[in-house]
Amino acid sequence: MRKTTNTIRIEGARVHNLKNINLEIPRNELVVITGLSGSGKSSLAFDTLYAEGQRRYMETFSAYVRQFLGNMERPDVDKIDGLSPVIAIEQKTTSKSPRSTVGTITELYDYIRLLFARVGTAYSYVTNQKMISYNEEQIQSLLLEEYLEQKVILLAPIIKSRKGHYRELFDSLAKQGFSKVRVDGQVVDLTPGMKVDRYKTHDIELVIDRFTVKKEETFLKRLNESLNTALHYGEDVMMVLRLEDNKARYFSKNLMCPTSGISYPIPEPNTFSFNSPKGMCPVCKGLGVQHKVNLKKIIPDDSISIAQGGLVPLGTKKTSWTYKQIETIAKCYHFELTDPIRKIPTKGMEVILKGSQEKFEIPSAVLGITRTYKIDFEGLEHYIESSYEEAATASIKRWASNYMDSYLCEGCKGSRLREEALNYRLNNCNIADLVGMDLKDLYTWISELDQSLNANEKKIATEILKEIRVRLEFLLNVGLDYLQLNRSSKSLSGGEAQRIRLATQIGSQLVGVLYILDEPSIGLHQRDNDRLIQSLLALRDLGNSVIVVEHDKDMMLSADHLIDMGPFAGKNGGEIISQGTPSETLKQNTLTSQYLSGKLLIEIPTKRRKSNGNSLFLEGCTGNNLKNIDVEFPLGIMIGVTGVSGSGKSTLVNETLYPILNEHLFNGVKVPLPYKKISGLKYIDKVVDINQSPIGRTPRSNPATYCGVFSEIRNLFTLTPEAQIRGYKPGRFSFNVVGGRCETCQGGGMKVIEMNFLPDVYVECESCQGRRFNRETLEIRFKGKSISDVLNMSINEACDFFEALPKIYRKLKMIQDVGLGYITLGQSSTTLSGGEAQRIKLASELSKKDTGNTFYILDEPTTGLHFEDIRVLLGVLNRLVNKGNTVLIIEHNLDVIKQVDHIIDIGPEGGSKGGELLFSGKPEELIHVERSHTARFLAKELELQLNTVT
């Protein structure tokens, strides 16, 4: 019998910068892969192990199915043995759909909808009375009980508060043998040609029968027939009108308010779905927001004229059809397009914005005739709104969104649901109340719910509540207690989305799977780190292998097996420099082991910088969970914004402060979250948000093009004698332009060979041998190097090569200084990690002329960075500050927090229990704040370092 292998064995892995490595990874253990940024961690974990696992999975399908699914490229590896089914849990945001929420992606909302559909109690949105439903027997019993010996009329409601003359309806009822109807409270005879005022709203009921209620057997037969007829014509709804006091009461087989007569259909799960027509708000179609045109964005400056571009969406294109229509409007309302907008008559401006279908006759003094002008113009506002709602392409929608703002839906107040769904309650809460709770509070509410249910409801709800509790527990265990189920998926950070997927996988209880995770600790405060580690260990204990690409110290020390890659990055990395248990790794002489043991550390500054005396002062911030806080941002120093996950850091900085600065300095269109006042804007002249988004989205984008150095290099090649003789321009040396590039591969350097049922194969272009340019272009050389040779240089090599050319050297030196000397000039931007992309952006900013009044914002810049990378990054940030600029960092990493000059701590908890300003001042002073979780961990770090130094 074949023995099951206890390891995953990799032989000859050469993906990206991997140096033909051979490796054995233990199965059913928590394995952490660490190393410098660019050392090959992701190449090993995702581009080798995961890629091969996915490829093998795809091969289990038939050739017919594979042609529809597409095929995956085989990773460059000789052999992988012992590979289990692979699931990768990456940092990608879950979904960009506005309909996707935390509740939908975790499936918790599905169970909550089911809970409300089965045991929720309906209330009238008119009277707030409990809704009731009856069957025929119950209605008959109630009539005999409550109306005995009383004269009543049985009515079938046909029209409820609608306009129309209803002549055809009355004629149809008369033909069916009915003689009377009740119109707006008055019983009238049906007469030929009868109709009512079509412009008024009416209530019309059909008179079915009129009698005195008795208990005689002959009467009961008549009553039963009349009830069935009334329910048939009233579509399961009927009325009883007592003649003594003219008081009506409704009865329905559906849920109905006995006083107002409104009815709800029998609830189903889709009654509470904002993605179903049965549940969604009819105003916003289940989105929770409405988009309306903002006039300030259409006319930012009313002192200039339309001809000068005063109507921003219109611009100055005088040949457009819209412009011609506005010329007609100007003639009709007697103004010139050269007049300042503020001087245009109110009516004329209204027609431009709202539209008109009018005809105008204007006499011409010159010709002595009268010309008729017809305005057939929908108005700029309507044009922009319809462009947004009916956009055929993403670019049109994006254009229209520049002139619109999002507002909370007036119909559902952001709940996404129609009125009926919001009036089902459980324990005094509707479904919107539940999805708006922090997950921690929701767990408490769900746990206590069965106390308010009767025996029958408990029996129905038991399994549903169990499923909800289990899923909530997993989310709480990965540190997401501050999220709400109605939180939009696209607003989640990569770390939050990853931990949601992790919780879902733990809940699936799969066994024998290989899980690969990419830095699950991103965005997680130290307080929650232990819970995350315990969740990963729980995944392992189920019988799974867990591989984590991670830089977090606690995660490394908790691993069963630690793989350290290096020794450096790029071409100088891609090797396994140590592996074993954490205790074995500590004995090695590697960068990682030295930082883990404390031999190397990022030191506390001997002196904190002082502000330049100026500040930004932001008052009355109330966005999301912020509790009306006033925050001062001292300028000219490094500021750290700290707090547990969900405390309000991103709300304060990314959603409030940055949009304000961007709007003030660059007319940014993003609307900041609510605040009262900001002062000190005059002290900054530029704001830069340096995030980890890619520097380009196509393989043709590279560090040289992003930093602007490639243009200088191309210009340099045109100045060579041979290029001058041939008349070559800069475009000749671009792989994106026809002429100089290789047309066989169109400047890509690689050709794709379609293999039908086998994966596509990428081969080196036979015409240019992967050099991207044609022979004539490659003949042009500068200092013996062709343009292709230059693109294949590492940044370190390029710095030496261009040292005598300040314009090029300065930009390359900045990339080298941020620790990216190992990447090549022409390296595709799609192969760069988030940390590498962020540092290239930093280098680009450093190379620009500096005013000394720039405000830099970085959100978790340590994502994907090793201890040594963080040290280099801090050196770069300190250079920016030393030039007089302000650097604001949102961060959990204690190595960064202890380096900043000023800390703003938000908390104390996440979600509704956060949003307070706990502290603003020096790091050494923060450690005395008892309510701050950051203070507790920072105190340990400062104490540890002092002891190490001592």
For the regions a protein language model found, what residue spans apply to each?
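Conserved phosphate-binding elements of NTP-dependent enzyme cores
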Residues: M1-T950
